[in-house]
Amino acid sequence: MRTTYMAKPGEIDRKWYVVDATDVPLGRLSTVVASILRGKNKPTFTPNVDTGDNVIVINASKVALTGKKAERKIYYHHTAYAGGLKERTAGDFLAKEPTKLIETSVKGMLPHNSLGHKMGLKLHVYAGAEHTQQAQKPEVLDITNLI
């Protein structure tokens, strides 16, 4: 009798990938990164287990915002005080905190529960070309053929 393989947390082999965000549209970058963080690129994908890999995104400040998203796309957050609704445009977000822009975009594509939080912790975003995870020997992932 054949049964469906269900991954167990101790059996997961995690890899490290480096993704260059230079001139890649934000949404397309985010979908590829979120898919890798979830583990959907592996044959051992199990929805209730974190089977994903670690992803390092470099050159976050050079990500592309297509169309007029830089002026028209607005990110909101609330300070929890009365009248504390704050808003920023995507262009302002990219200029001031490019790493947080990509983190927000990717984490919005992950499950909104404790498992999604664990997946989000495996995302490392850097504004420049240098990163601090050389010891993990990450593989360079060319996402132009994945988008």
From Swiss-Prot:
In terms of CDD domains, this protein maps to:
Ribosomal_L13
The reply on keyword Lyase is: no
A Pfam family matched in the record: Ribosomal_L13
What's any GO biological process attached to this entry? negative regulation of translation
| One GO CC annotation | cytosolic large ribosomal subunit
Quick check: keyword Transit peptide in the entry?
Answer: no
Top-level taxon of origin: Bacteria
Keywords, comma-separated and alphabetical: Ribonucleoprotein, Ribosomal protein
Q: Which HAMAP family match?
A: Ribosomal_uL13
Q: Which family does it belong to?
A: Belongs to the universal ribosomal protein uL13 family.
The protein here is known as Large ribosomal subunit protein uL13
From which organism does this entry originate? Lactiplantibacillus plantarum (strain ATCC BAA-793 / NCIMB 8826 / WCFS1) (Lactobacillus plantarum)
